[in-house]
Amino acid sequence: MFVRIVKMSFHSKHIKEFQEMFEEKKQFIRNSYGCKLLELYQDKTNPEVFFTYSYWENDHDLEKYRNSELFKSVWAKTKTFFNDKPQAWSVDKKISLK
């Protein structure tokens, strides 16, 4: 299992619309095959910056999601809200303490 982190920065005027869209689509994204967890974070000092953390069983499952109609439609709309280029990382968790 690995974590996909995506950093997105939005024009202020689009933040509410992005959050509404995420609220509407989050369960569909989370229910994608291989997705084990989905989280959305907002930067505390710059409210235009958001991060998604999604936990995936394997690379194949993430790629299958990224090629799905769900992803294509959500990403096409999300891209219109950006004020900067998004960044994404696939990372392996090394240590987790509770």
Predicted segment positions?
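Short acidic/polar alpha-helix capping motifs at helix-coil junctions
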Residues: 1-4, 15, 26, 39-41, ...
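Anionic, Ser/Thr-rich low-complexity intrinsically disordered regions
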Residues: 2-4, 34, 38, 67, ...
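Short, well-ordered beta-strand segments in beta-rich or mixed alpha/beta enzyme
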Residues: 2-9, 39-66
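Non-catalytic surface loops within mature trypsin-like serine protease
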Residues: 10-12, 58, 92-95
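Residues at alpha-helix boundaries and the short loops/turns that link adjacent helices
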Residues: 12, 65-68, 85
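Short amphipathic alpha-helical segments
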Residues: 14-37, 70-75
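Short conserved AdoMet
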Residues: 30, 57, 83
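Glycine-rich beta-strand-turn "strand-cap" elements at beta-sheet edges
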Residues: 39-48, 76-98
